[in-house]
Amino acid sequence: MKLLISQVEFEQLIGRQEPEPGVVLPQFTVIYFTAAWCSACRSLDLDALEKGVPGVNWLKCDIDQNDYTPGYCGVRSIPTFLIVHDKKVVGMLSSNKTQKVLEWVAAAAPPTK
């Protein structure tokens, strides 16, 4: 998973800031909020998440490296997942169950072409 390092990157995803010239933003992104010390986060199968639903752009936000974005998004616990679809935040889920997260993402994902 690519790291979501700054609030600027998040604001580009939700259309509050313009991306760099030539950068095409993904239509459907899931942001995974985590921390190195989070034992519940380690129980997730990140490979299964990334491969489980086609067409999903996955980003990881370490709350100790980027503490502004989780607060801005209302993240209260980790692991938490946030869906951004067509520049809108459309869902949030706090869970350390890989299958539950996959089912939630699959239900929200647009059909793949």
Where are the language model's segments positioned?
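Non-catalytic, surface beta->alpha helical segment in thiol-disulfide oxidoreductase systems
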Residues: S77, L82-K113
